[in-house]
């Protein structure tokens, strides 16, 4: 198994699909990486030479992925909460952020129903 960005990439899969195992790399970015490195999208990871895998590593290192991306996302959410803006308040209360209705739906975000006390 090749190790790129701290993740074991599956050997049996095509390069484009295998790169999506890295958090922060989707299909579009994986295709862009393959185009930039001149590696065929349909080539399987086990068929690549060590030099090609090193080139892939260098190309992936140009992007913010995995732990750094997760940290950046959580810091952005924390910043919104500290600012006290509307989105920050919605995050703090664990409610939907983007204008969805909450009178009847939003159970996933709000959690299980709480019984009404009498």
UniProtKB/Swiss-Prot annotation:
Q: Does the keyword Ribonucleoprotein apply?
A: yes
Gene name, per UniProt, is rpsM
Q: Its family?
A: Belongs to the universal ribosomal protein uS13 family.
Q: Which PROSITE patterns match?
A: RIBOSOMAL_S13_1, RIBOSOMAL_S13_2
Oligomeric form and interacting partners: Part of the 30S ribosomal subunit. Forms a loose heterodimer with protein S19. Forms two bridges to the 50S subunit in the 70S ribosome.
InterPro entries per UniProt: Rbsml_uS13_C (IPR027437), Ribosomal_uS13 (IPR001892), Ribosomal_uS13-like_H2TH (IPR010979), Ribosomal_uS13_bac-type (IPR019980), Ribosomal_uS13_CS (IPR018269)
Q: Which PANTHER family match?
A: 30S RIBOSOMAL PROTEIN S13/40S RIBOSOMAL PROTEIN S18, SMALL RIBOSOMAL SUBUNIT PROTEIN US13M
Per the record, the domain of life is Bacteria
List keywords of the entry alphabetically.
Answer: Ribonucleoprotein, Ribosomal protein, RNA-binding, rRNA-binding, tRNA-binding
**Claim: Ubl conjugation is one of the keywords in the record:** no
Q: Where is this region: Disordered?
A: 94-118
Q: State the name under which the record lists this protein.
A: Small ribosomal subunit protein uS13
Please give the organism: Shewanella baltica (strain OS155 / ATCC BAA-1091)
Q: What does this protein do?
A: Located at the top of the head of the 30S subunit, it contacts several helices of the 16S rRNA. In the 70S ribosome it contacts the 23S rRNA (bridge B1a) and protein L5 of the 50S subunit (bridge B1b), connecting the 2 subunits; these bridges are implicated in subunit movement. Contacts the tRNAs in the A and P-sites.
Gene Ontology annotations for the cellular component aspect, listed alphabetically: cytosol; small ribosomal subunit
Gene Ontology biological-process annotations: translation
Q: Which GO terms describe its molecular function?
A: rRNA binding; structural constituent of ribosome; tRNA binding
């Amino acid at each position: 198994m090749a190790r790129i960005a701290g993740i074991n990439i599956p050997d049996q899969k095509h390069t484009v699909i295998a790169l999506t195992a890295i958090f922060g790399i989707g299909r579009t970015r994986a295709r862009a990486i393959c185009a930039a490195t001149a590696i065929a999208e349909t080539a399987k990871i086990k068929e690549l030479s060590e030099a090609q895998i090193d080139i892939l590593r260098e190309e992936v290192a140009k992007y913010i992925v995995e732990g750094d991306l997760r940290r950046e996302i959580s810091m952005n959410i924390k910043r919104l909460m500290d600012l006290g803006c509307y989105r920050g308040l919605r995050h703090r209360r664990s409610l939907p952020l983007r204008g969805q209705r909450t009178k009847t739906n939003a159970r996933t975000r709000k959690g299980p129903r709480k019984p009404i006390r009498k």
